[in-house]
From Swiss-Prot:
Gene name for this UniProt entry: Fxyd2
Bilayer-crossing regions: 33-50
Gene3D superfamilies: Single helix bin (1.20.5.780)
Membrane topology, as annotated: Single-pass type III membrane protein
UniProt record similarity statement: Belongs to the FXYD family.
Region (Disordered): 1-20
Protein name: Sodium/potassium-transporting ATPase subunit gamma
Quaternary structure and interacting proteins, as annotated: Regulatory subunit of the sodium/potassium-transporting ATPase which is composed of a catalytic alpha subunit, an auxiliary non-catalytic beta subunit and an additional regulatory subunit.
Gene Ontology cellular-component terms listed: basolateral plasma membrane; membrane; sodium:potassium-exchanging ATPase complex
Domain of life: Eukaryota
Amino acid sequence: MAGEISDLSANSGGSAKGTENPFEYDYETVRKGGLIFAGLAFVVGLLIILSKRFRCGGGKKHRQVNEDEL
């Protein structure tokens, strides 16, 4: 029993699996996901900017200013 415990503690992370590390990432998948997220954020940002630009140029109401307020 003591030998089994020492064998488990000798492995990285204390797991019985041996060489499999749970903190290794598939960087290609992470990169693709990041690029997709960045592209979507860029497109949404452009849509927000363009929608505000076209809406603000429409019917502007000018307020009349009295000379007393100046």
